[in-house]
């Protein structure tokens, strides 16, 4: 049996790239739309989830929401952009509209050792109009 990561697509133009990069790391990865049937995903016995970005605001009418089975699974979850906002909101944090959007290159710094990210500063691309105002408690 393979270790499997599931990417849930919230409409990002980069979802295919994310899936491919996971596969290039020698990890089996499948991508599904955010509203996929839970039984279909959980039958794959994934080891974790990646939630993609997307063009919506988390508070827009009809905006995609985090499927309950993701948190109920107890598996590790990586939220990217909209996926992070959906995760934050589902866990009780607050997401708010930014006064202006931010687009372009940025840097993130890994402060604590972890198996997913290398230590130090990494270049990243950002494109968002909402922000995390307060983290879940």
Descriptions of predicted regions:
Residues 135-137:
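Short, intrinsically disordered, charge-balanced linker/junction segments flanking boundaries
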Residues 7, 126-127:
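Short beta-strand segments
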Residues 20-26, 43-116, 120-123, 129-132:
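Cysteine-nucleophile active-site neighborhood
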Residues 8-10, 34, 82:
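Cofactor-binding loop segments of dinucleotide-utilizing enzymes, especially the Rossmann-like FAD-
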């Amino acid at each position: 049996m393979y270790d499997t990561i599931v990417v849930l697509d919230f409409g990002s133009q980069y979802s295919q790239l994310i899936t491919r990069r996971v596969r290039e790391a020698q990890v089996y990865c499948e991508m599904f739309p955010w509203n996929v049937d839970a039984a279909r995903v959980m039958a794959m016995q994934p080891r974790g989830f990646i939630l993609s970005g997307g063009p919506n605001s988390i508070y827009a009418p009809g905006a995609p929401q985090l499927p309950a089975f993701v948190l109920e699974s107890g598996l590790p979850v990586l939220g990217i952009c909209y996926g992070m906002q959906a995760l934050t909101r589902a866990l009780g944090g607050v997401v708010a509209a930014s006064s202006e959007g931010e687009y372009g290159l940025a840097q993130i710094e890994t402060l604590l050792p972890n198996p997913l990210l290398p230590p130090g500063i990494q270049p990243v691309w950002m494109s968002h109009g909402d922000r995390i105002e307060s983290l879940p408690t």
